[in-house]
A protein has these predicted regions:
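PRPP-associated nucleotide enzymes
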Residues: 1-365
């Protein structure tokens, strides 16, 4: 767990063009961490029905606005994009740079694949690599961070490549749908990098809609269906207020298996994404009678119920936000919990199966 995580608060940084941006404060971080929230990214994460090119398009507005902010703060000067295949293809970094008049000097490509022996994962291997070095530049990356193994593997490879060329990076800007593990990993990496690049400014990490958590190893969740180190949920994370508000304004999104599911499958192998979502909801339907609904609610909201306003503020890391906003969000959550009393998990599962198959019928083989 991240040191001093309980002391971390989110504070508003800007609100512009429909994009809310928050900065993490109070963690004695070596790096900078931001959370951005925007209508299309909220839709992407609340509705697994968003598939194909729309997955990419959903991230354009938030990414472009953040690029503009970073350019104005002089965090990005000369840019070099690192595309870690295939997850990076969902992130509109080049398009956002173009929109915000940021010159992209080069684009590098890498792929990292898991190595298995006797059915067990034994490591990661760089399968494809085409790197370009831009001295003293900003490296731009877009990637989902769950366990973070792929990102660390690729970054160490790139940094070693730069060192062999006798050049260095100024900083690294990372756009991610990711979890708390990412903060822990990037703090350690910055310490590691500064041993041989003392002037390295660190990572600027932009999380879409929140810093989520992964189910820990051996934990399949209250439903017994979740995948450890892969599936994202709220508990132990920090959620953008607008995302919390939108999620709890609807009955079902909070109970999805994962906040994002498999980003690559959602865009390129839609039938696999459909299978995963339907497999989950059919699993919930089958075992609904044995799932403790109260425990599931507490797991998904991230805290025991009932909870006082003061404890809720601390748990959400909202103590530095406007009190009118947080009071409203607290009351909304109480209303959501109350409204769930008369709704069965079977009803939710049947509704989701019907909605999902109806919306994505054209993709179902």
């Amino acid at each position: 767990m991240i040191e001093n995580w309980k002391d971390v608060q989110i504070v508003p940084e800007f609100c512009d063009q429909g994009v809310d941006c928050y900065r993490l404060e109070g963690g004695h971080f070596l790096n900078e961490y931001y959370i951005v929230s925007e209508a299309e990214t909220r839709k992407l994460m609340n509705h697994p029905e968003v598939v194909g090119y729309e997955v990419y398009a959903s991230l354009v507005t938030a990414t472009s606005q953040m690029m503009y902010y970073l350019k104005e703060k002089k965090k990005i000067t000369s840019a070099n994009i690192l595309s870690i295949l295939r997850g990076a293809l969902n992130y509109p970094l080049e398009e956002s740079c173009y929109k915000e008049h940021i010159r992209v000097h080069d684009i590098s490509f890498m792929s990292s694949e898991r190595v298995f022996e006797n059915g067990e994962m034994t490591g990661l291997e760089i399968k494809y690599c085409k790197l370009a070095t831009v001295p003293n530049s900003t490296l731009l990356i877009g990637d989902i961070i769950a366990s973070g193994e792929t990102l660390v593997n690729c970054l160490r490879y790139v940094i070693n490549y730069y060192r062999k060329q006798g050049t260095k990076l100024r900083n690294i800007v990372l756009f991610t749908i990711g979890g708390t593990q990412g903060v822990e990993i990037l703090e350690k990496l910055t310490q590691e990098i500064r041993v041989y690049w003392p002037g390295f400014e660190g990572f600027v990490t932009v999380y879409y809609e929140g810093i989520f958590s992964c189910y820990e190893e051996g934990n399949k969740g209250v439903s017994g269906i979740n995948r450890a180190l892969i599936d994202f949920y709220w508990k132990g994370g920090i959620i953008a207020p607008a995302f919390r508000r939108e999620t709890l304004s609807m009955q079902n999104p909070l109970f999805e298996k994962c906040t994002i599911y498999d980003g690559g499958a959602r865009r390129y192998e839609i039938h696999e994404h459909i299978e995963e979502v339907l497999e989950f909801w059919n699993g919930v339907l089958e075992r609904a009678d044995s799932i403790d609904k109260q425990a599931l609610l507490e797991e998904k909201l991230g805290h025991p119920l009932p909870i006082s306003y003061e404890d809720w503020l601390k748990d959400c890391h909202y103590e530095k936000l406007d009190k009118k906003t947080t009071r409203w969000l607290y009351q909304q959550e109480r209303g959501f919990v109350e409204g769930m009393r008369d709704v069965s998990l079977k009803e939710i599962a049947r509704q989701r199966i019907d909605e999902f198959t109806t919306t994505l019928r054209k993709y179902i083989l």
